[in-house]
Regions:
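Short, Lys/Arg-enriched N-terminal segments with co-localized hydrophobic residues
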Residues: 15-38
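Conserved N-terminal subdomain of the carbohydrate kinase-like
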Residues: 40-155, 309-324
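Short pre-catalytic strand/loop immediately N-terminal to key active-site residues, enriched for Gly-Thr
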Residues: 50-51, 249-262
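Phosphate-handling active-site elements
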Residues: 69, 248-249, 274-288
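Conserved phosphate/ATP/ADP-binding segment of small-molecule kinases
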Residues: 156-248, 279
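Short, small-residue alpha-helix embedded
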Residues: 258-281
């Protein structure tokens, strides 16, 4: 990496954007390589939380770093994610029809649509309408079906939400449920997790569920089950299980025995950005795993409360470099 001085500011320049002669660049020459590629756009349907480094506050910087314009559709505004002892939430369901209508009148087009936290069945219906209106032949649809974790459904979960999520995920090109959400989508009892006596049992359940969900879709779909925790005393790891057109495989990352806000949103955002750029799902999972491992490891050193999220910002530069190799 070298640094170029523009007036009184110093900008780090990755080797991939630096001319062979490594000369000091002017503004025009510095940014001209980036303009060779048309900017991709992703509509991100998610909540906006003031604290917690999750949802849109995770998606916007990650997609921007990956060279994808993030066009937010806020489903709710929260003072902080729901893990805080005190928070206020404003549901934006009533606003969404006018918001989406304005985008339609402005002839908006998207290379990707990424759906995350939705407040209920009515919002899912609105998202399905959004997809019908804006999805084109080339548009990637990624759905993160937020419903629960660690064997338990979230407080806002309802049967109507589950039925809507089933319909929504069937339309997606990529889905990123955790194992609890995957079991809900596949109609496997939540307590199935409790019957897994060994890590082998847990991984087999995750792989079986991934394949079952993949077969439900009427088109090629990549199912990525995130955050499968294997707490082996000698070698604790966390797996992301992927069922793709190339088969099923496991990606292993270091296991940190703490839970942090926003890690699933960061993972899904990296997948969305990478896949929108044409990177295959398997490689995108590797990049997301590396990015999260570094971010969580750094956060652990500072003893940051889990509800505050992870220190991902300082590792965006590495994500940029890795995604352009």
């Amino acid at each position: 990496m070298i640094f170029c001085r523009l007036d009184l500011y110093f900008f780090p320049i990755l080797d991939i954007y630096t001319p062979i002669d490594r000369t000091i660049l002017g503004y025009k020459e510095l940014f001209s390589p980036i303009r060779r590629f048309s900017m991709k756009k992703a509509a991100v349907i998610h909540d906006l939380s003031g604290f917690g480094k999750c949802s849109l506050t995770a998606a916007i910087p990650v997609l921007s770093a990956l060279g994808v314009q993030c066009c937010p559709v806020a489903t709710a505004v929260l003072t902080g994610q729901t893990g805080y002892p005190c928070y206020h939430c404003t549901d934006l369901t009533a606003m969404l029809p006018d918001y989406i209508d304005a985008w339609g009148k402005n002839n908006a087009h998207f290379d990707a649509i990424y759906s995350g936290f939705l407040t209920g069945a009515k919002q899912i219906s609105q998202v399905l309408d959004f997809i019908r209106q804006f999805r084109e032949e080339h548009t990637l649809l990624l759905v993160d079906p937020v419903m629960g974790d660690d064997g338990n459904a979230y407080p806002f979960f309802t049967p109507g939400l589950l039925n809507g999520m089933k319909e929504l995920t069937l339309k997606a090109d990529v889905i990123t449920p955790n194992l609890t959400e995957a079991c809900l989508l596949a109609d496997i009892p939540e307590d199935a997790l409790l019957h897994c006596r060994t890590n082998t049992d847990l991984l087999k359940l995750a792989e079986d569920v991934a394949l079952r969900l993949q077969k439900k879709a009427s088109h090629p779909q990549d199912v990525v089950i995130t955050g499968v925790k294997c707490r082996d005393e000698k070698h604790p790891v966390i797996y992301n299980i992927a069922a793709t057109a190339n088969g099923i495989y496991r990606h292993e990352s270091p296991f940190f025995d703490r839970s942090f806000s926003g890690t699933g949103d960061l993972f899904a955002s990296v997948l969305c950005g990478c896949c929108t750029k044409g990177i295959c799902t398997e490689d995108a999972i590797l990049l997301a795993g590396k990015f999260l491992s570094h971010s969580i490891g750094d956060t652990m050193k500072e003893n940051t409360p889990g509800r505050d999220g992870v220190n991902f910002e300082k590792f965006l530069i590495d994500l940029i470099a890795d995604s352009n190799v």
